[in-house]
Amino acid sequence: MPLHLYNTLSRRLEPFSPLHPERVTIYACGVTVYDYCHLGHARSYVAWDVLRRYLTFLGYTVHYVQNFTDIDDKILRRAYENGETMATVSDRYIAAYHQDMAALNILPASAYPRATEVIPEIINLIQGLLDRGYAYVAGGDVYYAVAQFPSYGKLSGRQLEQLMAGASGRIEEEEEQRKRHPLDFALWKAAKPEEMSVYHPWEAPWGKGRPGWHIECSAMVRQAFGATVDIHCGGMDLIFPHHENEIAQSEAVTQQPLARFWLHNGFVTVNTEKMSKSLGNFTTIRDLLAQGLDPMALRLLVLQAQYRKPLDFTPEALTAAAKGWQTLGEALHLHQQIPLPPIDAAEVRSHPKTEAFCQAMDEDLNTAAALAVIFELAKTLNREQHRYLHGGGWGRSPAEVSRDWHTLVTLAQVLGLEAKEESNPALTVELTDEEIQALIAARTAARQAKNYTESDRLRDLLLAQGVKLVDQKDGTTHWFRVPSAP
């Protein structure tokens, strides 16, 4: 079965094919850079990173563009509060974004356009909307006239009347008086005297000011890809109004579809409530990592739910993800413990687990099912590793084990799950097997006596000497050596 993706526009699964046979274009709405990224952002950008990696695995060349919204009411407010310029605030949080995404092993985008870099394109697009009667000037602002776009609401599946009901309470009284329709939205905002200390407004034919949020993405998509992009993606909270408004702006000018596929990821929830900065229930990526959580465990947590489904964030889920990564990481390090013969890449492609993995991914990137395939391989390899290291010899031929391991590494990389090469430069004197067994026996005795301080001390002592312990459910302890740095 070819790759099928759920298209928000058609509200159904569709077989994916790009405009150009071997090249896929993707535009992902990026962050508004006024604060640090939280787990909801990790959820979005891990999802689109996996989409990109899987398309590459299928043989496509992928051009992935993700913007930064670096001018916005929230950024201006933060700059004013801090006594800084808008550019200073934006630059700080853009740098933090790159650090967070690198920690999560998210591939860099092909390009990261900033809204402030495309002001001429934005002005041209607004002028095109004015010329065609889709926009009007009011008090120095420019608004999009939604009533002029007959298919407004097609992405969210709602009529104007329904959308108006949802808009109640979101419109400032002064702004409402300038609008012809309550759902008309700002394409350009006139400069205000109180904002001059944090940014310099741009000149436009209708007056000095700055762009609205929605027009920025329309301009950046058009600059990067022309009229139509293969895939446009973002969080479900962007379906309306942001993506609905993007469609209205772009298609009114080009008369062509803005995107062939619209993909939206589900929310991260805390006690079933959406995690967001506005609700104050968010946890930043860097706070989680500062607590000692392995970035790959966080990535694994995100992947345990298919991207469109909600992901509930709990301490128990974090603990389970950390344990899962320990299992997977042990298998990924197998080559450091067991000599594996080389294999041909075709053997990975023809592996039954590769077929099962692709079946899961072809069903709208079902990472939960794909992970189940990966963990089956990991557990099989860990059993083989324990047998080999503890005198049991090979349970299967080295070639079979090597094929499994190379398949595991390849499939895990498609999900962006990659283990760093473990090393221990502190390892100076190698313990003998007998010394290791004696220390493990002493630790076991301490655990049975509930002397956990001594148990932990012995575990740490062994780890400092390059010996990693893996406690089993039956009470036994397996061990393996962590190679020292070359």
Curated annotation (Swiss-Prot):
Protein species of origin: Thermosynechococcus vestitus (strain NIES-2133 / IAM M-273 / BP-1)
UniProt entry tagged with the keyword rRNA-binding: no
Record carries keyword Nuclease: no
Residues annotated as binding Zn(2+): 29, 217, 242, 246
Cofactor(s), by name: Zn(2+)
Chain ranges for the short sequence motif 'KMSKS' region as given in the UniProt record: 274-278
A Pfam family it matches: tRNA-synt_1e
Subcellular location: Cytoplasm
Reactions catalysed: tRNA(Cys) + L-cysteine + ATP = L-cysteinyl-tRNA(Cys) + AMP + diphosphate
Record's subunit section: Monomer.
InterPro entries membership: Cys-tRNA-ligase (IPR015803), Cys-tRNA-synt_Ia_DALR (IPR015273), Cys-tRNA/MSH_ligase (IPR024909), Rossmann-like_a/b/a_fold (IPR014729), tRNA-synt_1_cat_dom (IPR032678), tRNAsynth_Ia_anticodon-bd (IPR009080)
Residue numbers binding ATP: 277
Designated name of the protein: Cysteine--tRNA ligase
Gene encoding the protein: cysS
EC number(s) per entry: 6.1.1.16
Cofactor binding mode and count: Binds 1 zinc ion per subunit.
Family affiliation: Belongs to the class-I aminoacyl-tRNA synthetase family.
Enzyme class: ligase
One cellular component term from this protein's GO annotations in UniProt: cytosol
Record-level Gene Ontology MF annotations: ATP binding; cysteine-tRNA ligase activity; zinc ion binding
Alphabetically ordered keywords of this record: Aminoacyl-tRNA synthetase, ATP-binding, Cytoplasm, Ligase, Metal-binding, Nucleotide-binding, Protein biosynthesis, Zinc
One BP term from GO: cysteinyl-tRNA aminoacylation
Span of the annotated motif 'HIGH' region: 31-41
